[in-house]
Amino acid sequence: SGRSRVVQAGDLVLIDDCYNANPVSTKAALDLLSLADGRKVAVLGDMFELGEKEREMHGQVGAYAAEQGIDCLYCAGSLSEEMYRAAKEAGISQAEHFADTDALLAALPELLHPGDSVLIKASHGMGYAKIVEALEK
């Protein structure tokens, strides 16, 4: 479904919210992640259809993740590069940006640790549902 579903996947807690994303819903999802146990990992992707301020809005989300005490930010997509940059500047040392969803998916097994709480959120067109499916296996 991908609408704020919390599931236990092995030794990870997943917050599957990959159906859609805009700045307001993504900040709300980061609020939820900030309350979780363990290391707080945000796996975010591009938010589409935001208009001419889209890069700025992605940057605001990255900075907000840092404000909320998120430990790690991993993101993919061209717009999310701004999110990554802002998160690094705002103090998230464990942040990485990937060119696309497949590159991110390939790297995740090395990046995630047992006990992590992991938010997965992006616009539907980013295909993040396959990340959730892979982690649930």
Protein language model features and the residues they cover:
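ATP-dependent carboxylate-amine ligase
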Residues: 1-137
